[in-house]
Amino acid sequence: MKLSKKISIWFTGYPASGKTTLAKKFKRELDKLEIPSIIFDGDQIRKLIFDNKSYDKKSRIKSALSYLKLAKIVLKAKLVLIVSTNHHTNKQRSLIKKNLKNNYLEIWIKTPLQVCMKRDPKMLYSKFKKGKIKNLVGGDLKFEKPTNSDLVIQTLKDKIPGQKKILSLLLKKKIIINEK
Protein backbone atom coordinates (compact mmCIF):
# COMPACT_ATOMS: atom_id res chain seq x y z
CA MET A 1 0.00 0.00 0.00
CA LYS A 2 1.14 3.54 -0.62
CA LEU A 3 -0.10 7.09 -0.31
CA SER A 4 -1.26 8.54 -3.63
CA LYS A 5 -1.46 12.17 -2.48
CA LYS A 6 -0.84 14.48 0.45
CA ILE A 7 -3.66 14.37 2.97
CA SER A 8 -4.54 15.83 6.34
CA ILE A 9 -7.20 14.21 8.47
CA TRP A 10 -8.80 16.48 11.06
CA PHE A 11 -10.61 14.90 13.99
CA THR A 12 -13.26 17.08 15.61
CA GLY A 13 -15.54 16.54 18.59
CA TYR A 14 -16.05 17.48 22.22
CA PRO A 15 -13.17 17.32 24.70
CA ALA A 16 -12.93 13.68 25.88
CA SER A 17 -14.83 12.41 22.82
CA GLY A 18 -11.96 10.08 21.88
CA LYS A 19 -10.18 12.16 19.23
CA THR A 20 -6.63 11.56 20.44
CA THR A 21 -7.26 7.90 21.27
CA LEU A 22 -8.62 7.24 17.78
CA ALA A 23 -5.84 9.30 16.16
CA LYS A 24 -3.25 7.07 17.86
CA LYS A 25 -5.07 3.88 16.84
CA PHE A 26 -5.32 5.11 13.25
CA LYS A 27 -1.62 5.98 13.21
CA ARG A 28 -0.80 2.43 14.33
CA GLU A 29 -2.85 1.12 11.36
CA LEU A 30 -0.83 3.31 9.02
CA ASP A 31 2.42 2.20 10.66
CA LYS A 32 1.49 -1.45 9.97
CA LEU A 33 1.06 -0.53 6.29
CA GLU A 34 4.37 1.38 6.37
CA ILE A 35 2.61 4.61 5.43
CA PRO A 36 4.36 7.55 7.10
CA SER A 37 2.20 9.73 9.31
CA ILE A 38 2.37 12.27 12.10
CA ILE A 39 -0.15 13.32 14.75
CA PHE A 40 -0.75 16.92 15.76
CA ASP A 41 -2.48 16.64 19.12
CA GLY A 42 -4.12 19.90 20.19
CA ASP A 43 -2.84 19.83 23.77
CA GLN A 44 0.72 18.91 22.80
CA ILE A 45 1.02 21.44 19.98
CA ARG A 46 -0.32 24.24 22.20
CA LYS A 47 2.27 23.43 24.88
CA LEU A 48 5.19 23.04 22.48
CA ILE A 49 4.64 25.78 19.94
CA PHE A 50 2.00 28.36 20.75
CA ASP A 51 2.55 31.26 23.13
CA ASN A 52 -1.19 31.64 23.40
CA LYS A 53 -2.54 29.56 26.27
CA SER A 54 -5.96 31.21 26.21
CA TYR A 55 -9.08 29.42 25.05
CA ASP A 56 -11.39 32.37 24.29
CA LYS A 57 -13.01 32.64 20.84
CA LYS A 58 -10.40 35.03 19.43
CA SER A 59 -7.55 32.83 20.64
CA ARG A 60 -9.18 29.73 19.21
CA ILE A 61 -9.38 31.36 15.76
CA LYS A 62 -5.72 32.36 16.05
CA SER A 63 -4.94 28.78 17.04
CA ALA A 64 -6.83 27.41 14.01
CA LEU A 65 -4.81 29.68 11.71
CA SER A 66 -1.59 28.48 13.33
CA TYR A 67 -2.58 24.84 12.83
CA LEU A 68 -3.35 25.65 9.21
CA LYS A 69 0.12 27.15 8.69
CA LEU A 70 1.76 24.12 10.31
CA ALA A 71 -0.36 21.76 8.22
CA LYS A 72 0.72 23.46 4.98
CA ILE A 73 4.38 23.00 5.95
CA VAL A 74 3.96 19.37 6.97
CA LEU A 75 1.93 18.51 3.86
CA LYS A 76 4.96 19.30 1.71
CA ALA A 77 6.29 15.96 2.91
CA LYS A 78 4.48 12.91 1.58
CA LEU A 79 2.82 11.67 4.71
CA VAL A 80 -0.55 11.53 6.41
CA LEU A 81 -1.11 14.41 8.80
CA ILE A 82 -3.52 13.48 11.59
CA VAL A 83 -4.85 16.48 13.53
CA SER A 84 -6.65 15.84 16.81
CA THR A 85 -8.25 19.05 18.01
CA ASN A 86 -11.83 20.13 18.53
CA HIS A 87 -12.08 23.23 16.27
CA HIS A 88 -15.58 23.65 17.58
CA THR A 89 -17.13 25.99 15.00
CA ASN A 90 -18.08 25.39 11.40
CA LYS A 91 -16.35 28.68 10.57
CA GLN A 92 -13.00 27.34 11.84
CA ARG A 93 -13.41 24.03 10.03
CA SER A 94 -14.52 25.75 6.79
CA LEU A 95 -11.51 28.06 6.89
CA ILE A 96 -9.15 25.11 7.20
CA LYS A 97 -10.95 23.10 4.52
CA LYS A 98 -11.01 26.06 2.11
CA ASN A 99 -7.25 26.53 2.48
CA LEU A 100 -6.26 22.87 2.30
CA LYS A 101 -8.76 22.06 -0.46
CA ASN A 102 -8.52 18.41 -1.53
CA ASN A 103 -5.80 17.71 1.05
CA TYR A 104 -8.38 17.81 3.86
CA LEU A 105 -10.67 15.20 5.37
CA GLU A 106 -12.88 15.85 8.37
CA ILE A 107 -13.75 13.09 10.83
CA TRP A 108 -16.40 13.89 13.42
CA ILE A 109 -16.02 11.85 16.58
CA LYS A 110 -19.67 11.94 17.59
CA THR A 111 -19.70 11.09 21.28
CA PRO A 112 -22.59 12.40 23.40
CA LEU A 113 -21.63 15.30 25.66
CA GLN A 114 -22.85 13.41 28.74
CA VAL A 115 -20.40 10.57 27.97
CA CYS A 116 -17.54 13.04 27.51
CA MET A 117 -18.40 14.68 30.83
CA LYS A 118 -18.38 11.31 32.55
CA ARG A 119 -15.01 10.34 31.03
CA ASP A 120 -13.39 13.72 31.78
CA PRO A 121 -9.76 12.44 31.91
CA LYS A 122 -8.32 15.96 32.20
CA MET A 123 -11.00 17.03 34.71
CA LEU A 124 -12.00 19.91 32.40
CA TYR A 125 -15.74 19.54 32.88
CA SER A 126 -15.26 19.16 36.62
CA LYS A 127 -13.14 22.34 36.76
CA PHE A 128 -15.72 24.16 34.64
CA LYS A 129 -18.58 23.19 36.96
CA LYS A 130 -16.55 24.47 39.93
CA GLY A 131 -15.91 27.79 38.15
CA LYS A 132 -12.15 27.18 37.89
CA ILE A 133 -12.04 27.45 34.10
CA LYS A 134 -14.09 29.02 31.34
CA ASN A 135 -14.18 28.90 27.54
CA LEU A 136 -14.75 25.16 27.55
CA VAL A 137 -16.33 23.54 24.51
CA GLY A 138 -19.33 21.69 25.89
CA GLY A 139 -19.41 24.09 28.84
CA ASP A 140 -19.87 27.78 28.03
CA LEU A 141 -18.75 27.37 24.40
CA LYS A 142 -21.09 25.56 22.05
CA PHE A 143 -19.78 22.78 19.83
CA GLU A 144 -21.34 23.35 16.41
CA LYS A 145 -22.24 20.04 14.83
CA PRO A 146 -20.23 19.62 11.63
CA THR A 147 -22.30 20.04 8.51
CA ASN A 148 -20.01 18.40 5.97
CA SER A 149 -17.82 15.74 7.59
CA ASP A 150 -16.25 13.12 5.36
CA LEU A 151 -16.90 10.51 8.04
CA VAL A 152 -18.88 10.41 11.28
CA ILE A 153 -17.71 7.96 13.91
CA GLN A 154 -20.20 7.23 16.65
CA THR A 155 -18.02 5.75 19.36
CA LEU A 156 -20.91 4.18 21.26
CA LYS A 157 -22.82 2.77 18.28
CA ASP A 158 -20.35 1.74 15.59
CA LYS A 159 -19.56 -1.96 15.30
CA ILE A 160 -16.52 -1.40 13.08
CA PRO A 161 -13.54 0.20 14.88
CA GLY A 162 -13.07 3.85 13.93
CA GLN A 163 -9.52 3.37 12.66
CA LYS A 164 -10.76 0.69 10.23
CA LYS A 165 -13.54 2.99 8.99
CA ILE A 166 -11.02 5.77 8.32
CA LEU A 167 -8.69 3.38 6.50
CA SER A 168 -11.63 2.15 4.42
CA LEU A 169 -12.50 5.77 3.52
CA LEU A 170 -8.91 6.43 2.37
CA LEU A 171 -8.99 3.30 0.22
CA LYS A 172 -12.39 4.20 -1.25
CA LYS A 173 -11.17 7.71 -2.12
CA LYS A 174 -7.96 6.21 -3.56
CA ILE A 175 -5.81 8.25 -1.18
CA ILE A 176 -4.16 4.97 -0.21
CA ILE A 177 -3.68 2.59 -3.11
CA ASN A 178 -2.31 -0.91 -3.65
CA GLU A 179 1.29 -0.85 -4.78
CA LYS A 180 1.05 -3.71 -7.29
Residue spans for each PLM region:
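Conserved beta-strand scaffold positions in the cores of enzyme catalytic domains, especially
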Residues: K32, I39, Y104-W108, D150-V152
